[in-house]
Amino acid sequence: MKKTLVMFAGVLFISGVVLLSTASVSLAYGEHSQRLAANLLVLQGDLRQLLETDTSDIHLHSLSLRIKEKLGLLALLVRSANEQDSTSNTHNPEEFRQLLFLFGSSELKPLLSKLESLSGKYPLVLSPILQSTFSPVFFKKAEEMHLRLCSGCHSGAMAENTLPAFDLFRQSRSISRLEFAARMLTGLRGDQLTSLQNPLTDTELSVLISYYRNEVNELSK
């Protein structure tokens, strides 16, 4: 018990330091810029699934719907990012307008190449705490967050729905940690720009990511 309390105290201290270090980053790298970068990574992951030959028809349909929706969202995200940082409008909406055309023309490989290039220009910058891996001592708290926020849709039971919500334990281990973090950042607020901000702190998100990637989940077996 004493060891656990010491570890939690350590995390609180680290979180405080991270808040100071991330504050300066946030000034130059705002919420909309982060959302833009995260959506670019999620789009690449969805597009790679779409290109896989063993993807089921129902998943192909749902992936197509999600990709089209996210591509349409990018231009709005660019404008919002520019408004948030009016001192340097580095995000050019013209770079994103051709993406929907490529998708509508079934030019999927050129589209993937373009998205990868854009991610190089607009990388997802994570705070140090979001890049950290937490030990199993924190997984009880993560389990509570999972049951409260995620399990209703992401238990795996909805995997064959028109818009499937995949098992997060399995998904987190089948893709890179960066892409999974991007999916958590975008998924917790939904796809609508006007929805509520992410309800979790970076520390809570990082604990959840560590939990999904490392915990043995009986329901996922």
Where are these regions (language model features)?
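Positively charged n-region of N-terminal signal peptides that target proteins for export
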Residues: 1-4
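Bacterial N-terminal signal peptides
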Residues: 9-21
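Immediate post-signal-peptide N-terminus of mature secreted/exported proteins
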Residues: 24-65
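Electrostatic cytochrome c docking/interface patches
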Residues: 30-32, 110-145
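Short, solvent-exposed, charged loop/turn and helix-capping segments
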Residues: 49-97, 162
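C-terminal capping alpha-helices of c-type cytochrome domains
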Residues: 73, 95-124, 197-221
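The canonical Cys-X-X-Cys-His
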Residues: 142-158, 184, 208-212
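Gly/Gly-Pro-rich "capping" loops immediately C-terminal to redox-active cysteine motifs
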Residues: 155-190
